[in-house]
Amino acid sequence: MRSIRSFANDDRHVMVKHSTIYPSPEELEAVQNMVSTVECALKHVSDWLDETNKGTKPEGETEVKKDDAVENYSKDQGGRTLCGVMRIGLVAKGLLIKDDMDLELVLMCKDKPTETLLNTVKDNLPIQIQKLTEEKYQVEQCINEASIIIRNTKEPTLTLKVILHSPLIRDELEKKDGENVMMKDPPDLLDRQKCLNALASLRHAKWFQARANGLKSCVIVLRILRDLCNRVPTWAPLKGWPLELICEKSIGTCNRPLGXGEALRRVMECLASGILLPGGPGLHDPCERDPTDALSYMTTQQKEDITHSAQHALRLSAFGQIYKVLEMDPLPSSKPFQKYSWSVTDKEGAGSSALKRPFEDGLGDDKDPNKRMKRNLRKILDSKAIDLMNALMRLNQIRPGLQYKLLSQSGPVHAPVFTMSVDVDGTTYEASGPSKKTAKLHVAVKVLQAMGYPTGFDADIECMSSDEKSDNESKNDTVSSNSSNNTGNCTTETSSTLEVRTQGPILSSQQVAKILCGANEKRRGLKYELISETGGSHDKRFVMEVEVDGQKFRGAGPNKKVAKEVQRTLEKLFSGPNAANNKKKKIIPQAKGVVNTAVSDAVQAVRGRGRGTLTRGAFVGATAAPGYIAPGYGTPYGYSTASPAYGLPKRMVLLPVMKFPTYPVPHYSFF
């Protein structure tokens, strides 16, 4: 089964070919004007004939009773000489193409059409046309075709055939022999077969409008095949009603809508299967009461030639050469791809070749994800400082406990507008936004502007520490809390102060563990709070806050001042009024220490490879806690117990390892 992409390629070719054979808007407008004008003129001719016939009646026959008014009106309508005009052929089916625009109308008559009636209509029709339009038309009669030929005198040149017909001709043929009543035909009766063909065309038009017009791509394929019949003499005998039947049966029997290319292939498959050949299923005419073969007029040789041509066209279509069937240039691919040339390098030798991309200067970094990530990180570091607190967070820090109220909600359901308000020092501020959160943010911006604080997402840094100035750090983030060392250099408020901080350092896992473990050893029960989280999934920035001795510390990344930040944090943690108490020697109970140390060391040795120990450098410079030995690296690579990698801490008592298999493991063991 062919892929969908090949069908899509066929669809493109078929639609491009269809656009070249479809009539232009000017041609379609000319057709519509000509057909409408002739139809209206024939209506006027019918009225003129009725008035002429009524003028010849006696005066006594014109008196009509009121009770018989409706009945006589219907009889008069049915007794008109010209009953009506209807479209047939290409005009009714919508199958007009360029250079093949045969226009046909059928003029229904009450009686059998005669040459006298034909001449009468032909003589009065130009007069009625002149009353309707200023355009010039040539009107001729064609007795052999039982029709009137009308041609326009300007471009595009169009020809319209009006065929006279009467239902009485078919009614006589359908009567049985016993019921047949010999009626004298007029001596100048028009060709009976031409009239019957016109009536058959009328039935074909009605059938086509009911069955084929609703099928997707059916009309398009018919126009394509009509063009093929005009170009290729082999296909000419199939042109007309048989071609319409084949297309309707081929496309209508599919259980889903077909595209133009697939529908054309399905018709070709149907013809290539041999339905036209003798002994095949044939083609039944659905518009005839008796079983009729619509291909009866074709010879055996013509059927074989069409079948052979359809098989050849099907092979071309299967190999992606449908443009040859349509006689058009191949279209370029809808999805062009980059072609790489095979090149032979001198380094690899003359006999080696590889598929290589052309080298493009300046794009090497884009190919390497690591370089691209570093470049993006550099852009972030060089860009403006990222505000870790928006206006709403800053206002809540300055004035905690503010109550925001929803004043109104307006706008449609898909685009609501919320209006929020807040009362600050007796002044009410209002702002609107597409959501409550956005409206609150807009209110906070207004309040900060009124209070004189910097607003926006990029706040100005009011003061900096001496260490930050020495590092020439140009990109900073504004956060809370001025340092106590800079109170003389910064103007602040006593109650609510905008605190300024720099971005936190980029810490490795070992450095983070060193700070956290040291803080947990010195200050038990510290609580860390997540202030904000920014950045994409590949570049997250977390702002954490911890309170030590009543002073809050915040850290965020990325930055380059790793060593200084760690040093300042450790100095704050291990200095101050509590430093002396921390350095005091603690008395370690001998018995309990021996037991706990033995148990901890034994368990540490049993853990084995694959179970990581405590973080590297976690207890460097810290006093050993009672009851267990601070392991440091403890078990490098997890093979066996070992001394700490950075040396043993001061004042640490070394005890021998003792094993007590029956002694229970204490519940506070750290493993």
Curated annotation (Swiss-Prot):
This is Spermatid perinuclear RNA-binding protein. GO terms for molecular function: double-stranded RNA binding; microtubule binding; single-stranded RNA binding; tubulin binding. Residues 357-371, 466-476 have a biased composition (Basic and acidic residues). Residues 5-363 form the DZF domain. The keyword Nuclease does not apply. GO terms for cellular component: cytoplasm; manchette; microtubule cytoskeleton. It is found in: Cytoplasm. GO terms for biological process: cell motility; mechanosensory behavior; spermatid development. Keywords: Cytoplasm, Developmental protein, Differentiation, DNA-binding, Methylation, Repeat, RNA-binding, Spermatogenesis. Residues 477-497 have a biased composition (Low complexity). Gene3D superfamilies: 1.10.1410.40, 3.30.160.20, Beta Polymerase, domain 2.
